[in-house]
Every structure is written in C-alpha cells, then in structure tokens.
Amino acid sequence: MSGSQSSGSPGSPGPPGPPGRSALVVYGSETGNAQDVAEEVGALAERLHFTTQISELNHVKPESLRSYTIVVFAVSTTGQGDLPANARTFWRSLLLKKLPPTFLSGVRFTWFGLGDSSYPKFNWAARKLYKRLLQLGADEIYPGGEADHQHSSGLEGTFIPWLAGFRKHLLDKYPLPPGQDPIPDDVQLPPKWVLRLRDQEAASEDVSPPDAMGAAVTGDFPDSYRLDNDHRPLHDSLTATLVQNKRVTPQTHWQDVRHLILTVSDPISYAPGDVLTITPKNTAEDVQSLIEMMGWQEQADQLVSLVPRDSTRSTNELPSPPIHSLDSYPRLTLRELLINYLDIRAIPRRSFFAAIAHYTTYEMHKERLLEFTNPEYLDEFWDYTTRPRRSILEILHEFDTVKIPWQHATSTFPIIRARQFSIASGGELKRTSVGGARFELLIAIVKYRTVIKKIREGVCTKYISNLRPGSTLKIQLQRGGLNSSVGQLVGPTMLIGPGTGVAPLRSMLWEKAAIVKSYQEKNPGVDPPIEPTILVYGGRNRAADFFFEDEWQQLSDLIKLKVLTAFSRDQKQKVYVQDVIRENSSLVFNLLHDKGGAVFVCGSSGRMPQAVRETLTEAFQYGNDAGTQPFSRREAEDYLVGMEKTGRYKQETW
Amino acid sequence: MAPSFVSIDTTPDFDMTPTSSKSADSGKRTLLLAPPSIATQEDKLRTLFTTYDRSTTDLQMLDRVSAGFVSLPANTYDLVLVLTGTDGTRRSEALQLLKREVYAAVVPAMKGGAKLQTEDNFFGEAEDREAVLAGLVKKETGFEKMDVGNGAAVPLRLGRKKKAAPAPAPVVQPPPIISSDDNDLNDDELIDEDTLLSADDLKRPIVPPPECQPKAGKRRRACKDCTCGLAAQIEAEDRERREAADKSLNVMKLESDDLNELDFTVQGKTGSCGNCALGDAFRCDGCPFIGLPAFKPGQEVQILNDVAQL
C-alpha cells in the first residue's frame, strides 16, 4: 500500500501547526446518520491525501477550526429546528454575543445538512449554523448540501451527488503534486484504532463485574425474558432498574405495546416532552453466530483493549476512538464488546460494503460487494438493504467468504446507538416513594415483514421486550422539544397523539393534574385556575389499543379533560385523528383562537402531522361560528404560522 | 443565500431601566410595558413621556421582562400600563407577550393598591386568567393589587422560585440537564438563534433540489411519507413476490409448516441461473428463493414456521 501514508505525513513529524493539507470533518448527530455522512466525507478527504480528523462538534473548539485547510460540517436537525445534543456545546459557544465578526475569518468550510421535510423547520440546524459561520467571518468554499429523509432515495439521493461535486472541487483547488494519485477506493484505508489482546495474566486482577443477580422480581414471565445487567460506562448515563415490563395490548392484537416503568435512585427531575434514551445490546445468540461465522472462537473470550494502530502518531493527529471510555468496562472480552457495543443487526451503509469487500478473496463476492458501493447501483443497494431491512448479520451469512479480522471489528461495524423514547410519566408519577426518580415509557415492539422470509424485529425494542423486571439498563435523559411552560400547562391545550404518540401527552396531563392538586391543597375550596384540555387520540380498535383509557376517566374532572377518539378499524369507514378534529372544528377554533390555546402534536412523523396541520388550518378557516368575519385560507395559514412562532404549535414526532 | 453580514451589538437594545430608585417613594411611579415594535417609533416614545413624567416613569420592553432579563424594584409602582396603543393598534403584539413570566416579575414590583391597565382598556380571557393567577383583583378598568393586610391575594406559586414554603411536591423544576448542554454560558450572553433565520428560510428550497422523478430504467421508490399510493403498491408487490416465491417452493413440496427437506443437488430443483444458492444479493427478480438465506448446494433446508432453518 504505497499510497497509504496519506494521513500520517510520516517523513515530517513536525509540530502540529496548520499542515499543508488537512481536513476536519465535524458532525452533530442524533441518530448516527450525520456521523455516517461525516465518516464518508472523511474517507474521501483521506483518499485525497488530506490529514483528516473526524469528530463530534462538542469535541472541537471554534478557535481550532482555522488550523485546518478545510472544515466540513455534517449536521442533522432535531426537535424544533435544534442542533443535536452532541453539537450544542459547540453551537452555544458560537452564539456568544461578544464574538467579533472576524472571529472565524480564515476558516474555510462547507456543510451538509440532514433533515426531514415533513417538519416545518426542515434542516434549520444546518442553516442556522451556516448563517452564523458566515456572520463570524468564515468562508464557504463549496456550496453546502441538504439531504431529506423524505427523499425517495433517502439521504443518499442528495448526498452522493453532493459528495461527488465536493471531491471534484477538492481536486481542482487542492491538486495533488505530480506523481501522487488519490488512494483508489479499492485500497483499504487502515483503521486508526484496532483491538489488541491484553496480557491475560495482568488483566486477571481486574475487578469482575458485579453479580448479575440483583433484586430478582418474581412473576410470570416467559422463558425468553431474561434478567440482564448493564455494565457499560456510557456517557452521562444513569443506571435504571426495570420494575415493570407489561404488555398492554391483548395477545390477539397484531401489535405488542409495552408499558415500562424504570426507577433511578437519584432524585432526577424532568419535564413533559423529555426523552429517555436506551442503548440496546445484541443477543448472545446473534453474537455467537457471528463469532462462528468469522472464525473468532479462539479470541472470543479473551480480554481485549482498543488501541491506536500506529502508536508513533502524535495524539493530536489521532482521531478519537470509535467507542468512548471502553477502558473502564470491567473485563472486556471480544464477546462482551460484540454484545454491548457493535451494531451487528444494523442495516448497513454503503461504506460497510466497501469495508468488507477487503476481507474476501472470492472474486464473485468481492465484485458484488463493490457494486453495491457504486453510486450507479444505488437502486440495487437500496433494494438489497434498506427496502427489505436486511441486517449486517444476514449479509455476512450470505457473503460467507468474508472474514473480518477481529482486530478490525470496531472499525468495520457501526457502534450501537441509543434510541430515544418520549417519557410518558408526569406529576406524581415522576417520583418513587423513597425519593428516587421514576420513568414510564410506552413502547411499540417493532415487528414487520418484508420480502425476507424471517420476520424483522427492531433491535432496541427486541432488547427491551425480553428484559425481565429487576434488570438494569443504562439510560440517558435528554431535554425534549415540547418545552411546555407552566402557563401553557394550565392554559387551554389541544393534545394530539395517536398510538404511542400519546406518551409525552400523558406526561403533560399528569403534570397538569399535579399543578391542580397542589393548588387545591393550598387553596381549599377555590376553583383551580385550569383551562380545558382536549386530547385527540387515535388507534385501531378501542378494545385493543386505547391506552390509558381508565386514567383519562380519572383525570377528566380534575383537569377539565375532554377526550376525542378515532379508532380506524372499529367501523367500516376508517377514521383518523384529523377526521375527529374536522368534526369538531368549532370547538377547536374556540379553544385555539378565542381562548388562545396551544397545540401539541406527537406520534409518528410523515403523514399524520401533515394531515393534522391541514385540518387545523381548515378549522381556523371554517370553525368560527361566532358570526364574525371568517379567515381566508391565507389568514388561516398565517395564523398557524404565528402560533408556531410564539410556541403555541409544537410537534414532536418520530 | 446572500451572506448576511451582521455585527453583533452587545448593548441592550433599549435600556431605560430605572436610573435609580431615589424617587421611589416620592410621588406616583409608573411602569410602562412596551411591545418591542414601539422601539422603532421614536416620536411615539417622545409623546409618551409628555404624558408620563420621565422622572417618575420607567419603560420596559415586554419581551425582555418576559425573558427574565429585567429585574424590577420591589413594591415600587402605583400604575403599570401596557402600551397596547390607545386605539389598540399594538394590542395583539403586547398581549401576546403579556405572559405569566411578566406577571411574575411585575406584580411584586407593584405597590399595594397599584393598578395594572392597558392603554385601550382591554383584557382578554387569557390576560384575565393570568392576572388573577398572579394575585390581582379585577376592577372596572384593569386589575388592582390588593393592599397587604386586608385580604391577601393568593398568588399561585407554580414552582419557579422554590425558596420559601417547603412544597410537598415540587411541581415544576428546571428541566434536568444530563445531556452535554450544560456549558457555563448564560443565555444572556448569547444571541437568539431564532433570529438567524427568516421566514424566507422556511420556504427555501432544498439544495440541491430533490430529483423525485424516477430515472429512466430505474425502479421507482416511494417517499417515506408517500401519499400517492406508490408505497402501498410496492408493499403489495413485495407481498406478491413473497407469495409467489412461497408458492413456487410449495410446488417443490416445501410446505411452510412441514419439516421438509430439499436437496438442491437434484436436477431440476435449482434455478437455471445457478445463483439461487448464493443468496438474495445474487438472485434474479423472480427467484423462488427470494428472502431465504444463502445455502450450499446439497445443504438441507428446513422451513419451520416460515423461517428457514439452515
């Protein structure tokens, strides 16, 4: 691999100052897509002999951007047009008022945004960042790009053409010296971090993980339910104990929905709309099957550690390891690493095919794998992976000549990422009797069929569905996008959340109840100052998936709650939440317009929030039966936009 | 996408905070609460101060009070007037900003018996509620703060300030910050990120524009939120394909609930292309084995409950 000294500039180990040809690729990623984009951009730069660093935004300082030849930002949008959590520290440091307009002069950047056009604030995070970078004097050297999750070819549909253009730009503006060529795609870029066996003797002194037997909870659970403890030193995480894992839909119903209760010993507080993240694990069976396929039986249960491949490189040049704080995992074996960290059930990205093509010598397999990485075969790639939801494990079964060196496991497989779940508890449900925090979740277990015979299962919900109460999990608490103020909680509200979308709304309803109760305690006999709430709920059948029906009864008097329901399969004609809103348009108009109420829309992204938005606009147009002049279409639309601007229309969909 | 070159002004946009509270107890003090748009109309402001004596009158911007940027002196004002315009021209703007946070800041700054009024003498339902919640009493024109001593107003304390009174259940606490959000930067020192984008940005097309049209010869895909029926069509195709595949397998005596064995080395039972055994990545469009794992020629395949067991 003669061309592969690309990134090391081995001849000149001089000071880390601005090297002649360096690239920094930074990302703000919530679900991992922006990180994938960053990694693909990074690989491209490295192949063009840029000394390349890839990092999450929170790990870089704005002041350091200047020292790179080029900086590429890959940023997704979350919440109400916000930057992802792992970019917000950086972002806030850019928002400082005192920064002069020359603060970033000399910084040469481009950017790529990832968004979902079913959100009104499509790609706002990237656009805000772009504007702020310009305000602070940075130079956009290549026009940014934007990907849309709703695009028919997914993110790739816009990313691939953008990347091709950027590559051309780099070659034009930063030509390679005569005699030097880009590293071809079929030459593997050596991984920066590799696994090494640890000295087993010395390592034996490590503390072994605490006994898995915690407070065992008895009860009737299928054998598939296991008691599991989570030992991962995950960033900013809390150890939670699962105290309930209850199926709330009938066994006969097509969908398995779980009502989970988790407790934490610390008195953590949270607000409606906040989100809990859970990082799943792989099953022991899947990992065993991978170990056998790869022929790793000999190393599987030996202690390993993650080390830089090239220990001579200065730490400045060394990108951060693919997994953080792995050192503090108690007695890490290859098997534990596979179970806890590597996403072997992920739907692979194109870069995965490029990586594993290096690990087979069987021409037929190699050729096909490389075809899948070719943008011209995007359709076939999509038909083979995303469309049928084919996992890495299944692909390795099929391409069984691929033998990944175990040392490269962390650079070949994606890292298991955390999944977000809206918290369903609020008010008095937020605390345990002994002063700890309590979290409730409502989770639909993901199972579906594609053209692949074997039923598809969601990695995280499968992990959750088999946990026996008493198990521990590492959870992270994140602030959500609903940001309902106390004023909004006691004010008139319209809550729209079909299916498990009702979770964050339930949190709000219990929060309202707690406000009313505490007011009543202090002012006995006085009518609590609470305005009416309309909950619009939708499901398939009242009998099967009307979650928390009893609670709504219980809460309705306390907080002036009116529940409107739409059960699509309970009558011949399908009825959805938007239909119920339409039927009640004057009620809606009165609550939202006359009373100045706020709307919260939660649930699946895509069609539902769009239909709701449309129906609300219509309600503003036609719902005014007070006889005053009706809104025109334009005015109704403007009114909705106005609500959005003033935080009276909030959407949290997933 | 014209680069908007904005230098950042760090001075408060409209600073007329009480210069000192020396005259706090001499004469009647008035607090004017203005919607931000008034700041652009100097003449309007000048007229105001002909009506209200500058020396006993403070002006605050509603949005700044609402955002908690302003601390008002306690028990100081006899009149708080919301500048809705005498003809109500600024009513909607002003009232929109007259939120709970404003009451929380303003009511303690009012003397006992002080009045809260709007220029056009209008209070909507929402304002009424908030004012009452804040412990004010409705009067003919606006609201009044009860004199302490004769009948105490009961302000609804909804968290926020949790110093006094050991509340039995802390109802609202600041949201937890466990994510990496917690730098030490005060919001005060930051620009408002929402000002970075305008309404035009909302409408800005995606760059580069999406190529939704299918390319010639390429299979068409449905968008994630497909409404045109393509998604359903594709799903139906997939189902059909799966069923067709099931059927072809059954022709070869592979009942899905039977434990059947199939020897792929037997003539006529393997696809003519010879690629079937390699897996979906190599199978052709109508392959009956689509969706089944790869197998070795000669390997026994059992189909148990619709799942191939290799």
UniProtKB/Swiss-Prot annotation, chain A:
Keyword Ligase applies: no
One Gene Ontology cellular component annotation held by this UniProt entry: cytosol
UniProt entry tagged with the keyword Plastid: no
GO BP terms: cellular response to oxidative stress; iron-sulfur cluster assembly; nitric oxide biosynthetic process; positive regulation of nitric oxide biosynthetic process
Names of required cofactors: FAD; FMN
Compartment annotation: Cytoplasm; Mitochondrion
Flavodoxin-like domain ranges (all copies): 23-167
Enzyme class per UniProt: oxidoreductase
Region (Disordered): 1-22
Function: NADPH-dependent reductase which is a central component of the cytosolic iron-sulfur (Fe-S) protein assembly (CIA) machinery. Transfers electrons from NADPH via its FAD and FMN prosthetic groups to the [2Fe-2S] cluster of dre2, another key component of the CIA machinery. In turn, this reduced cluster provides electrons for assembly of cytosolic iron-sulfur cluster proteins. Positively controls H(2)O(2)-induced cell death.
Protein name: NADPH-dependent diflavin oxidoreductase 1
Species of origin: Emericella nidulans (strain FGSC A4 / ATCC 38163 / CBS 112.46 / NRRL 194 / M139)
From Swiss-Prot, chain B:
Region (Fe-S binding site B): 273-287
Binding site for [2Fe-2S] cluster: 212, 223, 226, 228
Binding site for [4Fe-4S] cluster: 273, 276, 284, 287
Any one GO BP annotation for this protein: iron-sulfur cluster assembly
Fe-S binding site A: annotated span: 212-228
Compositionally biased intervals (Pro residues): 167-177
TM region positions: none
Molecular function GO labels: 2 iron, 2 sulfur cluster binding; 4 iron, 4 sulfur cluster binding; electron transfer activity; metal ion binding
Main subcellular location of this protein, as a coarse class: cytoplasm
Keywords, comma-separated and alphabetical: 2Fe-2S, 4Fe-4S, Cytoplasm, Iron, Iron-sulfur, Metal-binding, Mitochondrion
Motif window: Cx2C motif 2: 284-287
Subcellular location: Cytoplasm; Mitochondrion intermembrane space
Required cofactor names: [2Fe-2S] cluster; [4Fe-4S] cluster
GO-annotated cellular components: cytoplasm; mitochondrial intermembrane space
Start and end residues of each stretch annotated as N-terminal SAM-like domain: 24-154
Segments of this protein annotated with the region Disordered: 1-30, 165-184
Protein family (similarity comment): Belongs to the anamorsin family.
Described function: Component of the cytosolic iron-sulfur (Fe-S) protein assembly (CIA) machinery required for the maturation of extramitochondrial Fe-S proteins. Part of an electron transfer chain functioning in an early step of cytosolic Fe-S biogenesis, facilitating the de novo assembly of a [4Fe-4S] cluster on the scaffold complex cfd1-nbp35. Electrons are transferred to dre2 from NADPH via the FAD- and FMN-containing protein tah18.
PANTHER family: ANAMORSIN
Protein name: Fe-S cluster assembly protein dre2
This protein's encoding gene: dre2
